[in-house]
From Swiss-Prot:
Protein name: Probable cell wall hydrolase LytN
Gene: lytN
Residue ranges occupied by any Peptidase C51 domain in the UniProt entry: 241-378
GO biological process, one term: cell wall organization
Highest rank taxon of the organism: Bacteria
Length: 383
C-alpha cells in the first residue's frame, strides 16, 4: 500500500509539475509576445514620427524654394538684382533688415558678404544663405541713389580744365562802404545807383536820417552803367583804331603772366592791356566776373550783345560761365565784323585752347561767333 501510494503521489506530482511548466511557458510566451508587440509598436511610432518630420522638412524646403523662385522672378522683372539662395533656410529665423540708411543682417554691415551660420536656429538642412555685396538688392540701390543725390546737393563743384576741381565762387553782389563825414544815405544811394529804401532794408536802418561816421554799410556792386562817351570824329576814330591795333600786334605771339600765377591765362593778357591803358589790372575771381567786380564809370562803356551790335578794335569781350570750366573767358577784339554779316568777330586770345597753364599757348588770333550772353567793354582810352 505504501509503495503504491508513493508511486501514485509521484505520478501526481509529476503531472502537476508538467502543468506548472506549461503555465510558465505560456506566461513567458505571452510576455515575449507583449514585449515584441510593444517594441514593434514603438518602432512603428518612431518610423511614423520620422516620416512626419521628413514630410515637414520637405514642405519647408518646397515652400522656401517657391519663395526664392518668386523673389528671383520679381527681381528680374524690376531691378534685375540677384539673390543667391543656397539650400532651404528657415525664413522665420533669418533677420535681414534693409532701410534707406543701412542694411544689416545679424550685426554685420551689408558692405561685407552676409553669411548666416550653419546652426539649428538658422538652418534646418545644414545649408547657408549667402548674399553677395556685389549684387545689391533694390533697397540698397535706392539708398545709394538717395545718398548720391544728397551729396550732390551739398557739393557745388565746377570742372576747371586747367587745374581739376575747384569750388566756384560767384562774383559778390554787395560791397562794404564806410560812412564818412558829410555822407547821407541819399548821396550814397545816388553814388551806387540804388535807392535809400534799398540801403535801409539791406542794413536794417530804422531812421534814414541817422547814420554814423565809420558805420559799415552794405551797398550794391557798381552796376552795368553806360555813361555817355566823348564824341570822336571819324578821322580820329580811324587813327585811334590803328594805334590800338598796332599796340595789340606787340602782344601777339608772346605769353603773358600778369599776376605770376597759373601760367599764361586769358585774364593775364587782358590785364596787361588794361594796365597799359589805365595803370592797373582788373578785378575778378574768374574772367566772367570782370563786368561786375570793377568800376568802369570813368574808364569804359558796357555793351550787351544784340543782333545789330558791332564790336570795335580794342574792346574787351567777356564770355559767360558756359566757357572756361565755369570761369568764363576774355579776349581783345581785333575785327568786329570778320564775316561781313555781324555773325563773327576776330580777337586776340590767350589760353583759348587750355594750353596757357603749361605756358604752351601764346597770345594768338581766334575767330569767334557772337554769343547772345556776351558782354563787351569799350575803353574810353585808345592804346
Amino acid at each position: 500500500m505504501f509503495v503504491y501510494y508513493c508511486k501514485e503521489c509521484f505520478i501526481m506530482n509529476k503531472q502537476q509539475s508538467k502543468v506548472r511548466y506549461s503555465i510558465r511557458k505560456v506566461s513567458i510566451g505571452i510576455l515575449s509576445i507583449s514585449i515584441g508587440m510593444f517594441l514593434a509598436l514603438g518602432m512603428s511610432n518612431k518610423a511614423y514620427a520620422d516620416e512626419i518630420d521628413k514630410s515637414k522638412d520637405f514642405t519647408r524646403g518646397y515652400e522656401q524654394n517657391v519663395f526664392a523662385k518668386s523673389e528671383l522672378n520679381a527681381n528680374k522683372n524690376t531691378t534685375k538684382d540677384k539673390i543667391k539662395n543656397e539650400g532651404a533656410v528657415k525664413t522665420s529665423d533669418t533677420s535681414l533688415k534693409l532701410d534707406n540708411k543701412s542694411a544689416i543682417s545679424n550685426g554685420n554691415e551689408i558692405n561685407q558678404d552676409i553669411k548666416i551660420s550653419n546652426t539649428p536656429k538658422n538652418s534646418s538642412q545644414g545649408n547657408n544663405l549667402v548674399i553677395n555685396n556685389n549684387e545689391p538688392t533694390k533697397e540698397i540701390k535706392i539708398a545709394n541713389l538717395e545718398a548720391q543725390n544728397s551729396n550732390q546737393k551739398k557739393t557745388n563743384k565746377v570742372t576747371n580744365n586747367y587745374f581739376g576741381y575747384y569750388s566756384f565762387r560767384e562774383a559778390p553782389k554787395t560791397q562794404i562802404y564806410t560812412v564818412k563825414k558829410g555822407d547821407t544815405l541819399s548821396a550814397i544811394a545816388l553814388k551806387y545807383k540804388t535807392t535809400v529804401s534799398n540801403i535801409q532794408n539791406t542794413n536794417n536802418i530804422a531812421n534814414p536820417n541817422l547814420i554814423f561816421i565809420g558805420q559799415k554799410l552794405k551797398v550794391p556792386m557798381t552796376p552795368l552803367v553806360e555813361p555817355k562817351p566823348k564824341t570822336v570824329s571819324s578821322n580820329n576814330k580811324s587813327n585811334s583804331n590803328s594805334s590800338t591795333l598796332n599796340y595789340l600786334k606787340t602782344l601777339e605771339n608772346r605769353g603773358w603772366d600778369f599776376d605770376g600765377s597759373y601760367g599764361w591765362q586769358c585774364f593775364d593778357l587782358v590785364n596787361v592791356y588794361w594796365n597799359h591803358l589805365y595803370g592797373h589790372g582788373l578785378k575778378g575771381y574768374g574772367a566772367k566776373d570782370i563786368p561786375y567786380a570793377n568800376n568802369f564809370n570813368s574808364e569804359a562803356k558796357i555793351y550787351h550783345n544784340t543782333p545789330t551790335f558791332k564790336a570795335e578794335p580794342g574792346d574787351l569781350v567777356v564770355f559767360s560761365g558756359r566757357f572756361g570750366g565755369g570761369y568764363g573767358h576774355t579776349a581783345i577784339v581785333l575785327n568786329g565784323d570778320y564775316d561781313g554779316k555781324l555773325m563773327k568777330f576776330q580777337s586776340l586770345d590767350q589760353n583759348w585752347n587750355n594750353g596757357g597753364w603749361r605756358k604752351a599757348e601764346v597770345a594768338h588770333k581766334v575767330v569767334h561767333n557772337y554769343e547772345n550772353d556776351m558782354i563787351f567793354i569799350r575803353p574810353f582810352k585808345k592804346a
